[in-house]
Regions:
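Hydrophobic packing residues in well-ordered alpha-helices of helical domains and bundles
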Residues: 21, 75-82, 144-147
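Charged, low-complexity intrinsically disordered terminal regions and linker tails
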Residues: 112-113, 153
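Alpha-helical bundle segments that constitute or directly flank the non-heme di-iron/ferroxidase center
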Residues: 1-6, 23-41, 145-153
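A hydrophobic membrane-anchoring alpha-helix module
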Residues: 141-166
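Short, helix-capping/interhelical loops that line the mouth of catalytic, cofactor-
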Residues: 31-102, 163-169
Length: 169
């Protein structure tokens, strides 16, 4: 088990070490909630989230990159939320086919500049608007690919944070 100090350790030495292990875990959960409920929810759950049993009550931090740290701080609570978020992903994947995921498309009107780099990872399912550089389109299939790549990155960062503290990864 990690101590609170180990969970919250950060460093300015590397870009990947600016978020603690706790924040990495929290971001894994919030990322799933943001993508699948906030961004895709109106298409995937047009009648609300009742079928998801209480998943309409999660709160994001004001920064929007992780869960509200006033409510979701303890690692055990974060892991429950991560499990709930993964349950949403599982529910969607069980309800969709590859073909249906390729047909569903989300219009993003506030696409951040770092998506220029992310776009290179998506040979299908992601495209830019012809004129407006802030608008992009992403399919549900590409969204799950993005979530997968993000999860690998954050899990790897957790391992690096542990190693940087002299903890076996």
């Amino acid at each position: 088990h990690l101590t609170e100090q180990q969970l919250d350790w950060t460093s300015d030495n590397w870009e990947w070490s600016k978020w603690s292990i706790r924040r990495q875990v929290s971001h894994l959960a919030s990322g799933l909630f943001v993508w699948l409920l906030h961004r895709w929810g109106h298409q995937l759950f047009p009648h609300g989230y009742a079928e998801l049993k209480g998943l309409d009550d999660h709160l994001l931090a004001p920064e929007g990159r992780w869960l509200d740290e006033n409510k979701y701080w303890d690692l055990s609570v974060l892991l429950v939320e991560l499990g709930r978020a993964m349950g949403v992903a599982k529910h969607i994947l069980e309800s969709e086919t590859v073909a249906s995921m390729r047909q569903k498309e989300l219009i993003r009107t506030d696409t951040q500049p770092h998506w220029n780099q992310f776009a290179t990872l998506h040979n299908t399912g992601f495209r830019w608007h012809d004129v407006n550089p802030n608008i992009s389109y992403i399919t549900l299939e590409a969204t799950f690919r993005h979530i997968y790549f993000g999860a690998i990155t954050h899990i790897y960062n957790i391992q690096r944070l542990k190693r940087a503290q002299g903890i076996s990864a």
